[in-house]
Every structure is written in structure tokens, then in C-alpha cells.
A protein has these predicted regions:
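Short, well-ordered beta-to-alpha junction loops that form the rim of enzyme active sites
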Residues: 25-26, 85-89, 114, 165, ...
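Residue-level preference for the first positions of well-ordered beta-strands
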Residues: 20, 176-184
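Acidic, low-complexity terminal tails and accessory targeting/binding regions
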Residues: 2-20, 104, 118-132, 195-259
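Short, active-site-adjacent cap segments at secondary-structure transitions
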Residues: 29, 90-92, 117-118, 189-191
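Phosphate-handling substructures
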Residues: 29-55, 101-166, 223, 234-237, ...
Length: 259
């Protein structure tokens, strides 16, 4: 069945936004610091901010502007009518860049704490090597139960993130039918939305995760099918042409540093 911007056909009530984009934030200073720490074999990631306050890097700012330019270049009737963002600084900066590129005020961006990064608890700021050295029992537990179900002390599992995103999906279906919605979040947020919208199981989404990271400012796009009863994947991991040759942040969903 083809996709459509119409909210309903043949008297059937639509249940979804007409268009949905789920985007990872631009490269952050935490991404850079984590990659340096991992490559140097360090135990801890050197960050001056708490995770929620980590800003975009200079490259991340450029990526956010490029994403905004791409969105602003869409025909007006195809641009987002609603922008939702994680409360984390790097995501809000990315969302604001898009809003400004489209000539919208900063107030056009609505922040929602349910879109925040997965919380890593006691493992926050530790590198992979640091976790193995400092928390060997947790490292073994993660291997045993798998990343989908593993919850570090004080942190979240993928299931916990999915649980909070289910309520956002419900909001989209109740309050934003026929709208064009842009969501700016984090890598695990993108993957968990895919799990929900495409009705995946654990094995399927983890196989996708193993294929590689979601690019910074990478776009996963859905369109409502003709009757509005479901969403169809249009593309995933798409980056605006200006960003096509940029490096992708390495390490998939490691419990360390800012994602």
C-alpha cells in the first residue's frame, strides 16, 4: 500500500502522523571525548559536563545546520509541523538549528524528558576497558542477559527506554494524527522507536544495532500508509548530502559517555 499525506480514506480514521522523522543529535563533545578515551585505553572519559549538559562539538553544530538546511529545503507542505526534542543540551541544540533554518522561533521546539538518553547509572563515563576492570561482575552480567535486558545499577535497560517511549507513541496517535513530526534524540532512542513502530523483536533490533551506529544527524523517516492505520519506513540512517562523507561516531550503545 502506498504512502499518503491524507489522514484517512474511505471513512477509516487515521491513527498516525502523516510523516515522522526520528533523528540522532549532531556530534557532541562527549562523542569526541569518549572516542579519544577508548582509543587510548583509558578507564574514564574526560568530560567537564554531566551527560545532560554535554553540548555539540564544532562539527556537531555544522551537522545540525546542514540538517536544518535540508529540512528547510523541503516544500513547505512537507516540512515538520511539530518538533520534539530530548531535554539533553546536544539534542536541543540540534532541534533549535532545524527550527531556525525553517524560520521558526525557538519556542517551536518542545522538549520532552521521555526522549532523553538511556541512563547508564554507575557505568556512566566509564570506557569499555574501564567497565571490565572496575565492574567485572556487571560486565559478565551484561554478557549473560544481553544488552536488551541488562540494567546497570541506577541505570536503564533498552526495555526501560522502550517503556517510556510507548507513551510518546500513544501521544502521537492521540494528539498528532495527520501532523508532520520531527523527533530529535539519541542513538538508542532512534533504535527503540524502530523497535516499536516496526513491531520488531529483540533479535531483529539488535541485529540492526550490530550493523553500525546511527550517524550523527542521521534521519529515520516514516510515512503514513494510505488509510493512516500504520507507518511505513521510507529510509533510515539518511544524512543530508552535505554530511555524507562525515565520520560516524564509533561504538554501538556502549554504557559510557554521551550518545
Amino acid at each position: 500500500m502506498g504512502v499518503s499525506e491524507n489522514s484517512a480514506v474511505a471513512g477509516v480514521s487515521a491513527q498516525w502522523p502523516a510523516r515522522l522523522w526520528v533523528v540522532r543529535h549532531g556530534q557532541s563533545a562527549g562523542n569526541v571525548a569518549r572516542d579519544v578515551a577508548e582509543s587510548n585505553g583509558a578507564t574514564l572519559i574526560d568530560l567537564e559536563h554531566r551527560d545532560a549538559d554535554v553540548p555539540l562539538s564544532a562539527l556537531g553544530e555544522r551537522q545540525a545546520r546542514a540538517l536544518g538546511a535540508w529540512m528547510a529545503g523541503l516544500p513547505e507542505h512537507e516540512r515538520p509541523t511539530l518538533i520534539l526534542s530530548s531535554t539533553y543540551v546536544r539534542a536541543r541544540q540540534t532541534a533549535l538549528a532545524v527550527a531556525r533554518a525553517m524560520g521558526q522561533p525557538d519556542t517551536a521546539v518542545s522538549v520532552d524528558e521521555r526522549l532523553r538518553e538511556k541512563e547508564f547509572g554507575v557505568l556512566d563515563r566509564y570506557t569499555t576497558a574501564g567497565i571490565i576492570a572496575t565492574f567485572p561482575e556487571l560486565s559478565e552480567q551484561r554478557k549473560l542477559v544481553g544488552k536488551f535486558y541488562f540494567r546497570p545499577p541506577g541505570g536503564e535497560s533498552w526495555c526501560d527506554v522502550i517503556f517510556r517511549l510507548r507513551s510518546i507513541v500513544g501521544d502521537l496517535q492521540r494528539n498528532h494524527v495527520g501532523a508532520r513530526v520531527l523527533i530529535v534524540g539519541h542513538q538508542v532512542i532512534v533504535n527503540c522507536f524502530r523497535y516499536l513502530i516496526e513491531q520488531m523483536d529483540e533479535a531483529t533490533i539488535l541485529a540492526i544495532d550490530r550493523e553500525g551506529d546511527v550517524p550523527n544527524c542521521g534521519v529515520t523517516e516514516y510515512a503514513a500508509v494510505a488509510d493512516g492505520q500504520s507507518l511505513e519506513l521510507v529510509r533510515t540512517k539518511f544524512v543530508p548530502p552535505e554530511l555524507a562523507d562525515e565520520p560516524v561516531t564509533t561504538e554501538s550503545d556502549q554504557p559510557a559517555g554521551a550518545r
